[in-house]
Curated annotation (Swiss-Prot):
Gene3D superfamilies: P-loop containing nucleotide triphosphate hydrolases. It comes from Staphylococcus aureus (strain MSSA476). Keywords: Amino-acid biosynthesis, Aromatic amino acid biosynthesis, ATP-binding, Cytoplasm, Kinase, Magnesium, Metal-binding, Nucleotide-binding, Transferase. InterPro entries: P-loop_NTPase (IPR027417), Shikimate/glucono_kinase (IPR031322), Shikimate_kinase/TSH1 (IPR000623), Shikimate_kinase_CS (IPR023000). Its EC number is 2.7.1.71. It holds the Pfam family SKI. One of its GO terms (biological process) is aromatic amino acid family biosynthetic process. It catalyses: shikimate + ATP = 3-phosphoshikimate + ADP + H(+). Belongs to the shikimate kinase family. CDD domains: SK. PANTHER family: SHIKIMATE KINASE, SHIKIMATE KINASE 1, CHLOROPLASTIC. It is an enzyme of class 2 (transferase). This is Shikimate kinase. The gene is aroK.
């Protein structure tokens, strides 16, 4: 990556396809990709649920922000965790970045993807109404910092890929 360039940063609720699409675009374009959740798990040798359980959500949010700062100049594409905007520091940091792409999805589809997923501590044992409340509370923040929004339930991975490719070419960064 040219370190004078800004990475594409994927934001959005859990289960919207940030990791899948980020990896797909990176593979297709031979770009570097970092999934912040995976980066945290590898660096700290704990799963996200273990971090939540042992240290709490606020501790995890601090790690998430620290890792985002570490990765911002080393990756072409970054997939953030869905709750990264819960940290005021991370939110303000992201507000000052370029190329923030918000992946959104219908809550019913999200629920079917993440219901009972043991790797998602903020989704475990939640009803669809509880998950929808969390989803709605985060959407305003995603909207505030997003450069572009894609509805991942309306577009295929390849359609999102081509849209992102057009953005990459338009920014003439890669």
């Amino acid at each position: 990556m040219n370190h004078d360039k800004s990475p594409i940063i994927l934001i959005g609720f859990m289960g919207t396809g940030k990791s899948t699409i980020g990896k797909y675009v990176a593979d297709e374009q031979n770009l570097s990709f970092i999934d912040i959740d995976s980066y945290i798990e590898e660096k700290y040798k704990l799963t996200i649920p273990e971090i939540f359980s042992k240290h709490g959500e606020q501790y995890f949010r601090n790690l998430e922000f620290t890792c985002l700062q570490e990765c911002i100049n080393t990756a072409d594409i970054i997939a953030t965790g869905g709750g990264i905007i819960e940290s005021e520091e991370a939110f303000n940091f992201l507000k000052n970045q370029k190329n923030i792409i918000w992946l959104d999805c219908n809550i019913d589809i999200i629920y079917s993807r993440i219901n009972d997923d043991p790797h998602r501590p903020n989704a475990n044992n939640k009803t669809i109404k509880q998950l929808n409340d969390l989803y709605c509370s985060r959407n305003l923040r995603y909207n505030e910092i997003a450069f572009k929004k894609f509805d991942s339930h309306l577009l295929s991975i390849s359609e999102i890929y081509y849209e992102l490719l057009n953005l990459i070419k338009a920014s003439d960064q890669y």
